[in-house]
From Swiss-Prot:
<dbReference type="InterPro" id="IPR007300">
    <property type="entry name" value="CidB/LrgB"/>
</dbReference>
<protein>
    <recommendedName>
        <fullName>Antiholin-like protein LrgB</fullName>
    </recommendedName>
</protein>
<dbReference type="GO" id="GO:0012501">
    <property type="term" value="P:programmed cell death"/>
</dbReference>
<feature type="transmembrane region" description="Helical">
    <location>
        <begin position="5"/>
        <end position="25"/>
    </location>
</feature>
<feature type="transmembrane region" description="Helical">
    <location>
        <begin position="178"/>
        <end position="197"/>
    </location>
</feature>
<feature type="transmembrane region" description="Helical">
    <location>
        <begin position="143"/>
        <end position="165"/>
    </location>
</feature>
<feature type="transmembrane region" description="Helical">
    <location>
        <begin position="94"/>
        <end position="116"/>
    </location>
</feature>
<dbReference type="GO" id="GO:0031640">
    <property type="term" value="P:killing of cells of another organism"/>
</dbReference>
<keyword id="KW-0812">Transmembrane</keyword>
<feature type="transmembrane region" description="Helical">
    <location>
        <begin position="32"/>
        <end position="54"/>
    </location>
</feature>
<keyword id="KW-1003">Cell membrane</keyword>
<feature type="transmembrane region" description="Helical">
    <location>
        <begin position="64"/>
        <end position="81"/>
    </location>
</feature>
<dbReference type="GO" id="GO:0005886">
    <property type="term" value="C:plasma membrane"/>
</dbReference>
<keyword id="KW-0204">Cytolysis</keyword>
<comment type="similarity">
    <text>Belongs to the CidB/LrgB family. LrgB subfamily.</text>
</comment>
<keyword id="KW-1133">Transmembrane helix</keyword>
<dbReference type="GO" id="GO:0019835">
    <property type="term" value="P:cytolysis"/>
</dbReference>
């Protein structure tokens, strides 16, 4: 079957699954479990399983969609441009907050994975979950992780932030728009930015820069943990 499969198969499956997710999210008035990315992932898994298709057959076209993830992150520069004055004024506080948050995320995942006895491949797959998909997947592959698990971890993490991010900020009385945006972007990448956009331009801009910096920090920090994994 693999020899007769065309790239359009993976593309069509992805678009239909995402379209269904978008409709469910709209008609459920934003219910977090119907976030389009999460729904598309679940429907894709079910379709491949029921149809007895292999991941390789799907990924012939799926990887073509993945190719556009990296250039798509350029869109994060738009809200940043609008808030460049605040970025210049608070650059040190912004950078230090994101770096500390990124490192803490990797450390927590590492400790929890060790504590519950996850095997090396699964642990390696979980470590990059703080980064956006375009960055997390290459990191996972480079350290021997399983991209499918990494993708699930990234999306699940983002869904949690999308659903509960505003509640956490309110609970811990985080009121400054810069702090809100940094927290959302550092913890929830693209969906964190979506929440930031709903809150305001400053939150959106700070969330956007957090997504970018978290990716860079994750690339640098994760190799430091590799000697301890085994």
């Amino acid at each position: 079957m693999a020899s007769t499969m065309t790239p359009y198969f993976g593309i069509v499956v992805s678009l239909i699954a995402y379209g269904i997710g978008t409709l469910l999210f709209k008609h459920s008035k934003g219910f977090f479990l119907f976030t389009p990315l999460f729904v598309a992932m679940v429907l894709g898994i079910v379709f491949l399983k029921v149809g007895n298709f292999t991941f390789e057959e799907y990924n012939t076209g799926g990887k073509m969609i993945s190719f556009f993830l990296e250039p798509a992150t350029i869109a994060f520069a738009i809200p940043l441009y609008k808030q460049v004055d605040k970025l210049k004024k608070y650059w040190w506080q912004i950078l230090s907050a994101i770096v500390v948050g990124s490192i803490c995320s990797v450390i927590v995942v590492f400790i929890v994975a060790k504590a519950i006895g996850l095997d090396t491949a699964v642990m390696n797959s979980m470590l990059p979950q703080a980064a956006t998909t375009a960055i997390a997947l290459p990191i996972s592959e480079s350290i021997g992780g399983i991209p499918a698990i990494t993708s699930f971890a990234v999306i699940f993490n983002a869904v949690i932030v999308y659903a509960l991010g505003a509640l956490f900020l309110k609970t811990f009385r985080v009121k400054h728009p810069i702090a809100k945006g940094l927290a959302l972007g550092t913890a929830g990448h693209a969906l964190g930015v979506a929440v930031g956009i709903e809150m305001g331009e400053v939150e959106a801009a700070m969330a956007s820069i957090a997504v970018t910096v978290v990716g860079v920090v994750t690339v640098v920090v994760i190799p430091m943990f590799m000697p301890f994994i085994g």
